[in-house]
Amino acid sequence: MPYDSVYSEKRPPGTLRTAWRKFYSDAPAMVGLYGCAGLALLCIFGGWIAPYGIDQQFLGYQLLPPSWSRYGEVSFFLGTDDLGRDVLSRLLSGAAPTVGGAFIVTLAATLCGLVLGVVAGATHGLRSAVLNHILDTLLSIPSLLLAIIVVAFAGPHLSHAMFAVWLALLPRMVRSVYSMVHDELEKEYVIAARLDGATTLNILWFAILPNITAGLVTEITRALSMAILDIAALGFLDLGAQLPSPEWGAMLGDALELIYVAPWTVMLPGAAITLSVLLVNLLGDGIRRAIIAGVE
């Protein structure tokens, strides 16, 4: 047999490799990945790398502008607030209650919503109809308004705000998973799997979940963005984290009256919140596009 007639078989790249190639070549997605990794590191080590304590006050250095300003000091890179506290230290320490708290809330809402949504999507009849009406009722209430109502009864505290945001995100997550599972169950490949003898659990695990991953990632990133904004909004309204907590929303609300005197005390926490939400959305969109490319 001649050797030149033997060819090596080329294996097509797998789903994960295709998805990673798509994700790696997407510049906004990589920006979101590195940015979210930086936020995660700040949530863990932000309090340790802060140059000063969150409540450490410096007499005679109140309302000091950032270091690049004419009257700024290098020792206080982002300036100080009205009590002489270092703004950079408070921003670094405030990543944990704002972004870290939002991540915990989103993770809990995702796990509970995934279980309830899959169970609701796989059932039919009266139970599905009752759950559908309950979810529609809860979804008619804005998430921030629902969180404010819960905090009004429980009292202002960061843990109460996190519970309120979780309670506001849960119906949206359940509804999204329910709709995706219900739509997938009506497709032909699920009917073919049932005729082939597959159980409901196998269909949900091996057929439904891989096909709703892209939509689920979109909902998770949307929920994380909403959680960051809602926790910051409750802190801004003095219903969440209480002063002297360095939570970004509480910092923003405390410095609001200084917007004309010391605008950096308002702009920097607001910029941190905006940048966090932007990075989360960039990462989520990149993951969704990569998953769709890998599945296709």
Swiss-Prot record:
Residues annotated as domain ABC transmembrane type-1: 99-284
GO cellular component, one term: plasma membrane
Disruption phenotype: Loss of resistance to protamine.
Any one Pfam family match given in the protein's UniProt record, by short name: BPD_transp_1
CDD domains: TM_PBP2
Residues spanning the signal sequence: none
Record-level GO BP terms: peptide transport; protein transport
Cytoplasmic side: 1-28, 120-133, 218-222, 279-296
Main location as per UniProt: membrane
Record-given protein name: Peptide transport system permease protein SapC
Organism (species): Salmonella typhimurium (strain LT2 / SGSC1412 / ATCC 700720)
Species classification: Bacteria, Pseudomonadati, Pseudomonadota, Gammaproteobacteria, Enterobacterales
Gene (UniProt): sapC
